[in-house]
Regions:
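Accessory alpha-helical DNA-binding modules that contact the DNA backbone or grooves
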Residues: 48-228, 245-248, 252, 284, ...
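Short hydrophobic/aromatic beta-strand immediately N-terminal to the Walker A/P-loop
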Residues: 292-295, 401, 501
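ASCE P-loop NTPase motor cores of helicases and related translocases
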Residues: 204, 220-373, 422, 428-437, ...
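Walker B catalytic acidic pair
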Residues: 378, 404
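Short basic/glycine-enriched coil/helix segment immediately N-terminal to the Walker B
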Residues: 356-372, 383, 391-398, 497
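Conserved helicase motor core of P-loop NTPases
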Residues: 406-521
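Short cytosolic juxtamembrane segments of multi-pass membrane proteins
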Residues: 34-47
Length: 521
């Protein structure tokens, strides 16, 4: 009885071995009965519900599992099961058994079961054999398995400490890990040193493994300034492509003559604004150049300039696409510009390849965007690979205007695209520096610029929109937050409590989000 009770765990391994043939017929029948009626009837196997499972069991008895897995065409003997459905049942059953065998293997080696389905989709029934032969296949950033776990598995399977596959996997892990932390490449000396420390291998062994990766073009090493930079192949190709496309776009120029000045004057009149000299130059530059950078801190009038560029492109008969890295930024861009904006990912048609774990985009060189001009806001959040994908989707001659604040944090992904383009001095750029009078009224904006200049922000003026309150006791802090949200801020700022957002650096504890939500609600 105890064995039967545990059959949901053990049946997969039994089916994969010759042990099942040695079981007494009654026990085997009980195992199959429990598996079919309780397990398969739950819907895990496509095409089988409780009634169908019992019919299969009644007809085939102890041979039911073998029939389903190896001779599913015999299931057509049961009324209601067509040849097509029989094949679907067999295929679904084989997949479920394969996933269970794989899950058992992962469980036995203390690896996350969440990796079972992605691995099965990628390698099918050969997954366990392939992992046993090449355990570092698991060192994949999409599988959420740490390198230390994979390495422990490999060592337990007999992989030697200086085995080339182990050293190469460690090198790739270091490059992937640093890419996740924002780095496009690593100096060769740092990469070798980090890998030696990670797996305890000698320098000569690591250098040889790195040379092997370079020969296979999995890693690309190129001289950069005074160091040899080591790139993941995709990072190197993205960087080279972005540089080449933008360099080519810098050569695109249009002679608009004095007509553009009149158009800008008309736009000012229609929008009820008067551009500062820097803003006017930005709008004019967008008319003349194939690629333009527009930068500035908060309150410097970037949005006003962008609205002018959009209106100018409309007057020129250009089909303009507005983009931003996030949904919130795209929504704000739409509201301020009076024209629909999209996220970059949505516009390019992002999809997820379950087999490779890679992000792909429908829009590319073969199927480019139907656009004459692209304006991208919040460029500081755009990483290198996303920038490369965007440029691949743009036809030659399509104008590009990049807008952002270089003093914001760089992108989460690898690369500091906006900052690097500004420092290159190659892209035509306009930097808005003057803070407009209306924006100067905001202490938030004044303090942002103060921090950029290395000055201490003003913190004590509780009549402003930026102030600091100190509370020593956690309970008192929660009480203050509730007072601010329910009384002081709504009365002072005229903001409904429902439109106030409270942020906390922790989830647990008196001042964590869980307790704050309870108190606020």
């Amino acid at each position: 009885k105890s064995l039967i009770a545990e059959s949901s765990v053990n049946l997969a391994s039994l089916a994969a071995s010759s042990v099942i043939a040695l079981l007494p017929p009654l026990l085997l029948f009980a195992l199959i009965q429990k598996h079919l009626v309780s397990g398969m009837a739950s819907g895990a196997v496509k095409g089988i519900r409780a009634g169908t499972a019992r019919k299969i069991l009644d007809l085939f008895g102890a041979e039911a599992l073998d029939i389903i897995e190896n001779q599913p065409e015999k299931l057509t003997q049961i009324r209601g099961i067509s040849p097509k459905r029989a094949q679907e049942i067999g295929e679904s059953f084989r997949q479920q058994m394969g996933v269970r065998r794989l899950a058992q293997f992962l469980s036995e080696h203390q690896l996350p079961l969440s990796a079972a389905m992605p691995l099965y989709r990628r390698f099918g029934d050969l997954a366990v054999d392939m992992i046993a032969q090449s355990p570092y296949l698991l060192a994949d950033r999409e599988l959420d398995i740490s390198f230390s776990q994979v390495d422990a598995l490999a060592i337990s399977l007999g992989v030697a400490g200086d085995d080339p596959q182990r050293v190469e996997a460690a090198l790739m892990f270091e490059l992937e890990h640093n890419a996740d932390n924002g780095h496009v490449f690593l100096p060769r000396s740092k990469l070798v040193a980090a890998t030696m420390e990670l797996i305890g291998a000698g320098e000569e062994t690591v250098e040889k493994a790195l040379d092997n990766l370079c020969q296979r073009f999995a890693v690309v090493c190129r001289p950069i300034a005074n160091v040899e930079g080591c790139y993941l192949r995709r990072m190197y190709e993205s960087e080279v492509y972005v540089a080449a496309r933008l360099a080519a776009a810098c050569g695109d120029e249009w002679d608009c003559g004095r007509n553009v000045e009149q158009i800008i004057a008309d736009i000012e009149k229609k929008q009820g604004v008067s551009y500062a000299p820097e803003q006017r130059r930005a709008v004019a530059l967008a008319a003349e150049k194939g690629v333009v950078l527009l930068t500035g801190g908060p309150g410097t009038g970037k949005t006003t300039a962008v609205r002018g560029i959009v209106a100018l492109f409309d007057r020129m008969g250009l089909d303009t696409v507005l983009l931003a890295p996030t949904g919130r930024a795209a929504q704000r861009m739409s509201q301020l510009c009076g024209k629909e904006a999209q996220t970059i990912h949505r516009c390019l048609g992002m999809s997820w390849n379950e087999l490779t774990g890679e992000v792909t985009f429908r829009k590319n060189e073969k199927e480019p965007l139907e656009a004459d001009a692209v304006i991208v806001d919040e460029m500081s959040m755009v990483d290198l690979e996303l920038m490369a994908s965007l440029l691949r989707s743009m036809r030659p001659g399509c104008r590009l205007v990049m807008v952002g604040d270089p003093d914001q944090l760089p992108s989460v992904g690898a690369g500091n695209v906006l900052g690097d383009l500004l420092r290159s001095g190659v892209i035509p750029a306009v930097s808005l520096t003057a803070v407009f009078r209306q924006a100067e009224k905001s202490a938030i904006i004044r303090n942002a610029h103060a921090v950029n200049r290395g000055l201490t922000p003003e913190l004590r003026n509780t009549q402003s929109d930026f102030f600091f309150l100190c509370r020593r006791a956690p309970d008192r802090l929660v009480q203050t937050v509730v007072e601010l949200c329910s009384q002081r801020l709504p009365e002072k700022m005229g903001i409904p409590a429902q439109q106030i957002q409270v942020l906390s650096p922790t989830r647990k504890g008196v001042c964590g989000t869980v307790n704050l939500n309870r108190a606020l609600q």
